[in-house]
Regions:
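Nucleotide-sugar donor-binding/catalytic module of glycosyltransferases
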Residues: 1-238
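Short, flexible coil/linker elements and helix-boundary hinge sites characteristic
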Residues: 26, 57, 61, 114, ...
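Alpha-helix capping and helix-coil boundary motifs
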Residues: 75, 150-156, 193, 250-258, ...
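Acidic carboxylate-rich catalytic motifs and surrounding loops in phosphoryl-/glycosyl-chemistry enzymes
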Residues: 124-126, 216-218, 255-270
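Generic detector of well-ordered alpha-helical segments enriched in charged/polar residues
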Residues: 157-158, 162, 182, 244-248, ...
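A general structural signal for short secondary-structure boundary/capping elements
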Residues: 169-174, 239-240, 260-270
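Catalytic core of nucleotide-sugar-dependent glycosyltransferases
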Residues: 217, 230-259, 280-290
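Membrane-interface aromatic/basic loop that binds lipid-linked glycans or pyrophosphate carriers
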Residues: 263-317
Length: 317
């Protein structure tokens, strides 16, 4: 019989953090062992990650606990996708190895999943703390005033995409219905090369069922901890390459044409947008041209989507 929930942890060369996260999980999972399974995807770590995994497999011997070690590093998004593809449980919760999670969270998640058998997506509200300074910079990331089950998942999530796109990129906050997120991976197999693909997976699930966005915060995002934060081109790539591509893909799963077009074209709404583009052109001319040409293609596709249904655009997408 399949488990209700898989708790999956993608990790790479952070054995100490993984050990700390599994310490939290060992406490939280008590009493719920029969509902859960644990999966660790090691992205070809060179530290003692494997020793940590084996240690906890012995400690948590009463829980189904499996792991995978990639033969080579397949990237952050590739390793997350590995976690999403592996489970056979009804739901999958992929958590970062460095994100602090409250002890009450797992119990709340399991209770809610049992209460709402048709749930497509649960998104846990969260706070944000800067790793370097330790300062709490965001007290509550998403503007949700209740834990109400919403059957209009697409409409609800469209509002969050418009209001706070960055918030939906936090992998540890999303609990997916497994069959839906695995369909999303099949629909867009190259999504692992897009740093914003988390938003697509989440929006895809929301478009195919009911959702819950919690009012209370249940975990904390460790900000400034990713290697991507050290890349000076990261914001430019997100703005002109990765996020626009996500909206093009969302056209195909039924998100409104005008909404997607608006979000793709928003990079030309203010004078500062042109300054960003010109600044990037001066700093990284070849990279900027390489990114901007496909962006122009996204602009044209979004414009044509107003006139033609998405099915007629499939060959272009």
């Amino acid at each position: 019989m399949n488990k209700l929930l898989t708790i999956a942890i993608p990790t790479f060369n952070r054995a100490q953090l993984l050990d700390k996260q599994l310490t939290w999980l060992a406490k939280s999972i008590k009493g719920f062992e029969s509902d859960c399974e644990i999966f660790i995807s090691d992205n070809c770590s060179t530290d003692n990650t494997q020793e940590v995994i084996k240690k906890w497999q012995i400690i948590l011997s009463n829980v189904k606990f499996t792991s995978n070690r990639n033969n080579k590093n397949i990237g952050v998004m590739g390793n997350i996708a590995c976690c999403l593809k592996a489970p056979t449980s009804e739901y999958i919760w992929t958590i970062g190895d460095d994100d602090p999670i409250q002890e009450r969270t797992l119990e709340y998640v399991l209770t809610t999943l049992k209460k709402h058998a048709d749930l497509a997506l649960m998104f846990l509200n969260f706070s944000g703390r800067q790793k370097r300074t330790g300062q709490l910079v965001v007290e509550r990331w998403l503007n949700s005033d209740s834990d109400e089950l919403r059957v209009d998942g697409k409409t609800v999530f469209q509002g969050y995409l418009n209001e706070n796109f960055g918030g939906v990129l936090f992998i540890s906050a999303a609990i997916y219905r497994t069959d839906l997120v695995q369909r999303a991976l099949q629909k867009w197999p190259s999504a692992t090369s897009n740093w914003a693909s988390q938003a697509y997976w989440t929006a895809f699930c929301a478009a195919h069922g009911s959702v819950i966005i919690t009012k209370d915060t249940y975990l904390e995002c460790t900000m400034g901890a990713s290697l991507l934060d050290l890349d000076p081109t990261w914001n430019f790539r997100m703005r002109y390459a990765f996020i626009p591509e996500v909206y093009i893909k969302l056209l195909k799963v039924g998100y409104p044409h005008k909404f997607c077009q608006k979000m793709i074209w928003q990079n030309f709404q203010q004078k500062t947008d042109f300054k960003i583009l010109l600044g990037a052109l001066k700093r990284w001319p070849f990279l900027t041209i390489k990114i901007f040409i496909p962006y122009l293609r996204f602009l044209s596709i979004s414009a044509w989507a107003i006139l033609f249904p998405p099915k007629q655009l499939d060959n272009s997408l």
